[in-house]
Every structure is written in C-alpha cells, then in structure tokens.
C-alpha cells in the first residue's frame, strides 16, 4: 500500500501535543479498508503460509471484552507473522444458527434470520473499531444458504460413507429449550450447557454421527498436538475415556445356560466381590418373575425420572437371583442399582465395597457384606479390619487364596491369565465416548437433508437439490417458533427413489455440525461448486494458530477433529488434524459487589465509597469479587465506550499487557489509563523528534549514549520477537517500554541516522500491538509505504556483546575496589589504571607488591 496524498505530512499538521486516538484510528481504518491492505494473498506459492484464526463469534448483538481479548490476541499473532514475510490468512465469520437467536427472536416477535443479520452488521462495525487485520472478503455466516448448502452436502458425504445412522434412543431433553442435547452438552450436575435446565430423559428416534469409529485415532493423535495446552488434551483424553480391563463372566445360579458379563478394570479385586449390580433396563430383569420385585422396579423408574438431579447412588432393589463368582465359586446376590448405566459396559458391574467408594456406600446402606482383599503393607497388616471408607490405593492381596501376598498390579495380570485359560475372562477395552447425537427439534438450524418415504425408508436428498432451505414464512407464538414439522407445505415432497408422496426430515442439525468445518471453508469462501477446494485446504490447513476459550475443549474442538478425519477419509483433502497450535485465553473479569447476606449484586452506580462499599438498601458491607463480566453482576465493561474514550490501541495494549493470555484478566480502569499515558508519551516523543532540529547539534553527540541505544534496539528486537513467539505478550510490552525509555533518554545525544533508525524500528515493534499510532507516526516520519508492509527487524548479535566489563580488585584476597575496563585492554593497561586509584593506593602504599594475578573478564588480585 502506497500512502495517498491526503495522508502525507503536509495535510496532517499536528498543531499541539495532544494524542487524538479516535481521529487517527478512524482515518487509518478507512484507508486500510479502501486499500484492501489485509487481503489474503491466495496466489502466492513462494511465500510461507500462516493461517491465524479466532473461534468465530455467535452474533449476540454486542461485543464484550471476552471477544476483544480473543480477537486482539489473534490479531497480534497474525500481524507479527505478516511482518515475517509470510502469506497470511486471517478471516472472520459468524456462528449464526442456534437456540439463543431463536429464543431472542421469539421474545421480539421477529424472524431469527432478521435478528441474526442485524446483529452481525452491528458486531462487525464494533470489531472494525479494533483495527483488526482481518480479510473481510472471506466473511460468511453459518446461516447463509450458500454455507449451509455445504453443511448438508457434507452430511450426505458422511451418510454415503456409513457414518450417519438413525435409531431410537433415550436422549437428554432440555425442557426449557425443548430440544435434545448431546452428552457433551450436559454438565457434571446434569444441567443444560446453555439454558441451565435440569436435563430429562426421553425416548426419541434421532440422527447420530459415528464419532466412535475414530475413537482410537482421536486419542492417539493427541500426541501429535505438541502445541496444544496440556489441560485441553487431558480433557479430551478423559472424555474419550479409554479403559483397559476385562470382561468377567458370571454364571447365574438359577438358570443353567444364563450368564452375565461384567466389565472391570480391577480383576485383582475379584475375591472381594460381594454382589453384582445391574441397570434398571438390563435384559436379565426379564428372568425375574417376582411381582413384588417388579413393582419396586417400576416405582424406582418413576422416581428416577422425576428426580434426575438427586443423588441416587445408594438406591437398590435385591433380586431373587444369585451369581457364581468364577474365581472361587462363591454365590453372590444380584441387585438392581440406580447407579449402573445401561450404556456403560454391559449394564452390569461387580460390587467390590472394600475397594470402590461408590460400592462401599451402596453396601453400607443396603447391608451387603464388605470383604477386604487388598492391604497397604503386607508385613504389618495381616488381617482385615473395619473400614471407614473404601481402600482404593495400590497394595498387596489378602483373602485371595494362592494370590495372597502379590502386589495388586501383578495380581491383575495373573488373575486375568487364569480367567482366560479357564474361559471366564477376556481382555477388553472400553471407551466413554458415545456417538454424536446431532438431531435438534428447533427451527433455527441447518435442515437435515433426508426424505422419509413409507416405501423406501429414509432417503438422502439428491445433491443437485441442495440446499434444503428453511421455510421463510414462520409462525411465532408467545413462547416458541413452530418446529419444521408444523409447516405442512414445506414438509410435503416426493421420494427421490420411487416418486411417491413423502415427507422431509423435520429435525435440524446440532449447531456444532456447522462450526466443526467452517475453518475448511475460509480458503475457498466464495467457491460455488463445492464446500472447499482440495488444493486450498491442503495449502492452508492446518490452522497455524487457533485462539479460543477452553470451554470448547470437548465440544467444538473434539467434533472438529473428528469431522476433519472423516472428511479426509472421503478423499476431500489430505490433512489429519485441523489446528496445529492452540491458545486458550483466560476470562476477562471485573470487580463485582455482592451482599453476602442477600446474595444480590449491587451496581457500582449505587455505591458511594469504593474504599468501604456498602449496600444502599441495608448498609451491609459488600464483598468485592473479581468475576467473569456479566449483566446480572453489574460488572460488564462496554468495549465501544472504552474505545471512544481511550482509543482501540489503548484497549489492545491493556488487554495484551495486563495478564499472560492463558490467565484470567482483571479489569482495572487505572491500568487502562496507564497504557493510554504510555501511548501519549510515545506520541509526544515523536513530535519532539519531528520538531526539534537543534538535536542535530554535533556538540551533543555522546559515543556512550549511541552505543547504549544501539544495544537497546537490538535487545528490544530479540526479546520482543521471542516473547511474541512464546505468547508472552505482557513481557513483550515491558520490553517495548524499556526501549522507549532508552530512546527518549538518548534522542539529543545520538546522530541523526541512528535516531531515525531507532524510531523506524520502534514503530515496527509497536505496530502489532498498537497498529494505528504506529502507522500514523510512520507516515509522518516520511515513509511512503504502510508500516504493516515492512519486514520485522533482525537483531545484531554482535551489538549485544559487552564492550567493557567490571573488574573486581582484591588486595590479599579482600575486595577493595571495582572498575569498568574495555574487553580488549591489556594486562599492562589494567595495572596502569588500577594501581593509581585512591582506593587501591591506600592499601599498597609503603608495602611491597609480591605479585599481581589477573583473570581477564573477572578479577585482579594484588598480593602485598
């Protein structure tokens, strides 16, 4: 980009020393847009590529500080890589389908499409205020017909390869949002990830994707992700939940040919099994004829359905069935237990109360025997004793026949081997991961491209008939938008196979389906014939730097990895993993004032004394907490108001300086003002530099100052470069401040060329952090091209070498003086300089010098 005439020095006379960020920023944002400065260089094959991407936002309507942090971090990294001469792809789009938009539209009585598009326009204008180096030509929203056409296309590709199926299943039902949730969308307390509702169970026919076909690859390939946070990889590993163990076969005493298979990771505790627990839907229940037991079971099912949020781990029903322990032929009771899940293992577990806390509590409440078979110390603890809790540590076997005395890990192997030989045990691997349920019973989502025919069953829509569009004219009631099944004209269609009357699938896809491939679309965002160009994906992917919240670790990130592998296997591209390097930024927090008596939060507007905050309603002392910004806590900060007051560059500098990116950031007005003052000082220094010709007086030149500034320049280049590469943006700004201090204290003492070179390099180093002020100063210095088209300076290692060192002077082994000497000084010159120094003379006068020992670079010892 060449500056046009209206940006040169003549038309930008700054008549005072005031830094006016809004004027500067508005001007340069307009110029950058007009000149298309950040357009992706799609055609360059010689340059190394860099794909920088933030997790795209849901268009809620307003930018918040969490957004700002995410996009500023990504922008800094993108700008830094552009300075390295790389070809940059830095796009932005919108995760636009989903329940929040539908619910907001219901509240306002408007079409969610209109609501979403309005929000996108507003948020885009807010994002542009930040001066992001985004290529807006790549922009799309997942609700665009020319995007969800390709979501449907990819669904059909997965269907063709056998990764899509439909089955009746007990599903997680959100009673507030009236839709199904995937397992990953239910939190540890059994609540919806979005609405917070207690999740219920329903039996529905649903569509699934076979993510379990890729379980082992998803797990093993975590090792390839060396530049991902370890905690994210651990979260995915735990969610996949690989368990190595064994299936143990227990015979049923009452039925000669009936057996029950139980999965366990602890064969070493087999001698301690005192009951078998089965789920409420286990097939073995069909063998029970006792009406009293069956009646209790029905009551338990009703209770569980009504009390899903309650702790039911101790609820059990004894049956009249007995199992035979294969290791010792002991007879053990079979219980129906609420804590046993149908979908885990075989829907049955072996109860070992002495060595599993859940089993221990169940046994205690139901008066079941507890038999200890592992002790901590085999030398001092020869017998069992009354346990207060289950013993779950490693140890040595007791009460286990010929396995007594073995450490439990060795016993696992030997017991399993015996079971394999005798036919009652087999090695087994289990996974916690379940197939991805993608059906949703709402309007605002991507329609599933399936036609249901009474003759032919479920038939995929012909690809040439995509997209299956959402009905435009919709019915909005007081509390819902009617689901797709309500639009009869839309539902009616013909079967593509037999031509008979048929109906469309009325479920929409989980919005995570749309967001699990969007990064593949950006390199070919305008392509009209396919979702993406294979060559473009192979060129630009994987994403070199992905930035987003850790809350997406087992939802978006896992789904995106799965979909990438599945589409690779459909020969759509050749990459294995979508994201090379992942940065999960911390939350932005601000002070919230809470009345601990009432639990209510008080608005800062109602607080008179912030040194001693009290509730104006009852004078209670308020607790000051730093919490995630929220409207309900009155601690939200509007980014637009901050930008209008201080400028985008100040907001960027604060966000990057206040805390390391992976840590939570605490908002502080004084810290924002501190960054603003720093930019003001930079601005004033530039004006002083530009307006003071007297600085070029050779009488002021100081060789030592010039050497010091040269060294500072190179230290800054080296340290800031390393800090950005290591995501240490706060320390990079600290180095920038040190460079500023050196520059400002040296200006009048150094020659013109060095001064200009220092300012040039300072501008480039500043540019990724504060791009507007750097561009303005660069332009006013007189450079014709944008600073953002420059190359990053390279530090000179030689300039960092010391030209002198501190020599410690000892007399008879005691330190008496210190002196700075040049690194090339001779020993004779050292003696001349030191022996005449007053602090040395007073210790050697009238004494005989026996010898002088000089260790160059360190010490001089005079022996007298």
UniProtKB/Swiss-Prot annotation:
Pfam families: Anticodon_1, tRNA-synt_1, tRNA-synt_1_2, tRNA-synt_1g. It is found in: Cytoplasm. One of its GO terms (cellular component) is cytosol. One of its GO terms (molecular function) is leucine-tRNA ligase activity. A motif ('HIGH' region) lies at residues 57-67. Keywords: Aminoacyl-tRNA synthetase, ATP-binding, Cytoplasm, Ligase, Nucleotide-binding, Protein biosynthesis. CDD domains: Anticodon_Ia_Leu_BEm (cd07958), LeuRS_core (cd00812). It comes from the Bacteria. ATP binds at residue 631. The keyword Transferase does not apply. It catalyses: tRNA(Leu) + L-leucine + ATP = L-leucyl-tRNA(Leu) + AMP + diphosphate. Its EC number is 6.1.1.4. The keyword Metal-binding does not apply. NCBIfam families: leuS_bact (TIGR00396). Belongs to the class-I aminoacyl-tRNA synthetase family. HAMAP family: Leu_tRNA_synth_B. This is Leucine--tRNA ligase. It comes from Prochlorococcus marinus (strain MIT 9515).
């Amino acid at each position: 980009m060449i500056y046009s005439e209206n940006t040169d020095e003549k038309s930008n006379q700054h008549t005072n020393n005031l830094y006016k960020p809004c004027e500067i920023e508005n001007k340069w944002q307009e110029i950058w847009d007009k000149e298309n400065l950040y357009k992706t260089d799609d055609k360059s094959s010689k340059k190394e590529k860099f794909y920088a991407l933030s997790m795209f936002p849901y268009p809620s309507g307003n930018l918040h500080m969490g957004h700002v942090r995410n996009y500023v971090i990504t922008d800094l990294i993108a700008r830094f890589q552009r300075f390295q001469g790389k070809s940059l792809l830095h796009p932005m789009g919108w995760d636009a389908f989903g329940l929040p938009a539908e619910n907001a539209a219901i509240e306002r009585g408007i079409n969610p499409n209109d609501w979403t598009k309005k929000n996108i326009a507003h948020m885009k204008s807010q994002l542009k205020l930040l001066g992001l180096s985004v290529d807006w030509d790549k922009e799309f929203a997942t609700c665009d017909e020319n995007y969800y056409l390709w979501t449907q296309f990819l669904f059909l590709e997965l269907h063709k390869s056998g990764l899509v199926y439909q089955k009746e299943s007990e599903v997680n039902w959100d009673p507030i949002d009236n839709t199904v949730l995937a397992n990953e969308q239910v939190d540890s307390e059994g609540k919806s990830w979005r609405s917070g509702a207690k999740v219920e169970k329903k039996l529905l026919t649903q569509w699934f994707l076979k993510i379990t076909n890729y379980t082992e690859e998803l797990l093993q390939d975590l090792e390839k992700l060396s530049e991902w946070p370890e905690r994210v990889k651990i979260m995915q590993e735990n969610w996949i939940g690989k368990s190595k163990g064994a299936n143990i076969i227990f015979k049923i005493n009452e039925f000669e040919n009936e057996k029950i298979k139980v999965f366990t990771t602890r064969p070493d505790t087999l001698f301690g099994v005192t009951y078998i627990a089965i789920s409420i839907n286990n097939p073995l229940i069909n063998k029970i004829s006792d009406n009293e037991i069956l009646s209790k079971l029905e009551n338990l099912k009703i209770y569980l359905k009504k009390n899903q949020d309650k702790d039911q781990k101790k609820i059990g029903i004894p049956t009249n069935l007995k199992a035979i322990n294969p290791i010792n032929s002991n007879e053990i009771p079979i219980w129906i237990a609420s804590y046993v899940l149908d979908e885990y293992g075989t829907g049955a577990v072996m109860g070992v109360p002495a060595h599993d806390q859940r089993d221990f509590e169940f046994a205690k409440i139901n008066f079941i025997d507890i038999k200890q078979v592992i002790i901590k110390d085999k030398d001092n603890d020869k017998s069992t004793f009354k346990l207060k809790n289950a013993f779950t540590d490693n140890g040595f076997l007791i009460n286990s026949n010929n396995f007594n005395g073995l450490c439990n890990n060795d016993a696992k192997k030997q017991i399993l081997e015996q079971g394999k030989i005798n036919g009652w045990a087999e090695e087994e691997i289990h996974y916690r991961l379940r197939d991805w349920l993608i059906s949703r019973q709402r309007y605002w989502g991507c329609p599933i491209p399936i036609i249901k025919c009474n003759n032919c069953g479920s038939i995929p829509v012909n690809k040439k008939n995509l997209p299956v569009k959402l009905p435009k004219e919709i019915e909005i009631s007081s509390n819902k938008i009617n689901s797709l099944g309500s639009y009869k004209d839309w539902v009616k269609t013909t079967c593509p196979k037999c031509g008979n009357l048929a109906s469309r699938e009325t479920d929409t896809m989980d919005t995570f389906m749309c967001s699990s491939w969007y990064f593949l679309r950006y390199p070919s965002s305008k392509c009209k014939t396919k979702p993406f160009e294979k060559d473009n994906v192979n060129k630009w992917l994987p994403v070199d730097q992905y930035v987003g919240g850790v809350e997406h670790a087992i939802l978006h990130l896992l789904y995106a990895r799965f979909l990438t592998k599945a589409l690779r296997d459909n020969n759509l591209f050749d990459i294995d993993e979508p994201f090379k390097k992942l940065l999960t930024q911390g939350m932005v927090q601000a002070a919230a004032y809470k009345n601990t008596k009432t639990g209510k939060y008080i608005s800062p507007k109602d607080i008179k004394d912030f040194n001693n905050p009290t509730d104006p309603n009852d004078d209670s002392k308020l607790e000051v907490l730093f919490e995630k910004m929220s409207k309900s806590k009155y601690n939200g900060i509007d980014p637009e108001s901050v930008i209008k007051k201080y400028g985008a560059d100040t907001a960027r500098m604060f966000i990057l300086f206040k805390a390391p990116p992976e840590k939570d950031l605490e908002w502080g007005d004084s810290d924002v003002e501190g960054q603003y003052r720093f930019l003001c000082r930079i601005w004033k220094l530039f004006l002083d530099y530009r307006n003071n010709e007297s600085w070029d007086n050779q009488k002021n030149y100081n060789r030592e100052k010039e050497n010091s500034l040269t060294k500072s320049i190179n230290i800054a280049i080296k340290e800031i470069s390393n800090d950005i590469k290591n995501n240490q943006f706060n320390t990079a700004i600290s180095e920038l401040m040190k460079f500023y201090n050196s520059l400002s204290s040296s200006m009048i003492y150094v020659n013109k060329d060095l001064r200009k070179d220092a300012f040039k390099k300072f501008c480039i180093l500043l540019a990724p952090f504060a791009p507007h002020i750097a561009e303005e100063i660069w332009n006013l210095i007189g450079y014709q091209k944008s600073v953002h088209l420059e190359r990053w300076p390279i530090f000179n290692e030689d300039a960092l070498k010391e030209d002198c060192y501190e020599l410690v002077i000892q007399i008879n082994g005691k330190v008496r003086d210190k002196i700075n000497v040049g690194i090339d000084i001779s020993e004779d010159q050292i003696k001349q300089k030191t022996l005449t120094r007053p602090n040395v003379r007073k210790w050697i006068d009238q004494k005989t010098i026996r010898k002088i020992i000089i260790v160059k670079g360190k010490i001089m010892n005079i022996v007298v």
